[in-house]
Amino acid sequence: MVASAAARPLVTVQGLDGDMSTDQSTTVTLPDVMTAPVRPDIVNFVHAQISNNSRQPYAVSKKAGHQTSAESWGTGRAVSRIPRVPGGGTHRAGQAAFGNMCRGGRMFAPTKIWRRWHRRVNVNMKRHAIVSAIAATAVPALVMARGHKIENVPEMPLVVSDSAEAVEKTSAAIKVLKQIGAYDDAEKAKNSIGIRPGKGKMRNRRYISRKGPLVVFGTEGAKIVKAFRNLPGVELCHVERLNLLKLAPGGHLGRFVIWTKSAFEKLESIYGSFEKPSEKKKGYVLPRAKMVNADLARIINSDEVQSVVNPIKDGSKRAVLKKNPLKNLNVMFKLNPYAKTAKRMSLLAEASRVKAKKEKLEKKRKVVTKEEAQAIKAAGKAWYQTMISDSDYTEFDNFTKWLGASQ
């Protein structure tokens, strides 16, 4: 991912009320660090590593779960061999202890404080991450995607005159933010204050809020710190101590940054350029983008590339797709034109055979009239009466004897 090329090599310095006429509507050169490649992979990795360095070691008590004189009852008692609490007269007596599967027992693999809490990160990688985060602050799309309200901001990157560093009161700081169109983002952070979910609210982390603008100043000991530090969501940082945790909170690129003129002019000397190494960071040169122009279609269709590209090859030979004529009728019809006629004749013969069979069955199934049905029923009843009269079972007292005699 490459930051979009700067449309102008100059950035306008936004003047404030009360500035001298010489300080208003001036311009500064855009430093090369603002056009460096944006590497979210490096930023995410470095942020995840250095954020571990502020962790406080924790562990469970070494005595937890073992503050009882439990002993195993051994075998032959029809219970498990887990250690059990001695004594009697209480529910606790006889209960299992010590094991991680027991109520009141220790946890599995109790945590220790000698865990490797901190992470070491290569110096060059940390510098690349900060450079990428700085470059992302100049891309309005990334800043808006992060959720900052910059609709009323006149220009990105946003640079204000050095008179902002002399602001002492918070009311004056709010006035400055309103003049440059950045107060909407600070207001968003203020309105987002809420109570933290979970147990963190009991541990001095009760309130959470969104991030507002980051004010970067260039004068050591400037009064601007006291003016802006009490605004919710607004953070401050000296240009020589830029921190990735502030430039890309959560590892997410696109923090809304307000630069003072003096801080913006120092970026070139602190981070150097693509050809000239940094004056403050020994031997550091800005990373170059793999593609100077990210518009690949424009590069391919340019006259320089098209003049040396080989023409499109025509008449390429492709393998013939062979189909089985025994399974594919269209292929069979191409190979044997008579197959279509033979297929039709077989279908007609089958249809005529089915029709003849149906007619034959209908002819055999003679329709019986109502009178004939009544005559058949009467004949059946007469035959039944004859069978009863001809039998001599009434002469036997026991019907089963008649059955035996008849057999």
UniProtKB/Swiss-Prot annotation:
GO terms for cellular component: cytosolic large ribosomal subunit; cytosolic ribosome; nucleolus; plant-type vacuole; plasma membrane; plasmodesma; vacuole. Residues 57-96 are annotated as: Disordered. GO terms for biological process: translation. InterPro entries: Ribos_uL4_C_dom, Ribosomal_uL4, Ribosomal_uL4_dom_sf, Ribosomal_uL4_euk/arc_CS, Ribosomal_uL4_euk/arch. One of its GO terms (molecular function) is structural constituent of ribosome. Keywords: Ribonucleoprotein, Ribosomal protein. The keyword Ribosomal protein applies. It holds the Pfam family Ribosomal_L4. Gene3D superfamilies: 3.40.1370.10. Disulfide bonds: none annotated. The keyword Ribonucleoprotein applies. Belongs to the universal ribosomal protein uL4 family. This is Large ribosomal subunit protein uL4y. The lineage of its organism: Eukaryota, Viridiplantae, Streptophyta, Embryophyta, Tracheophyta. The gene is RPL4D.
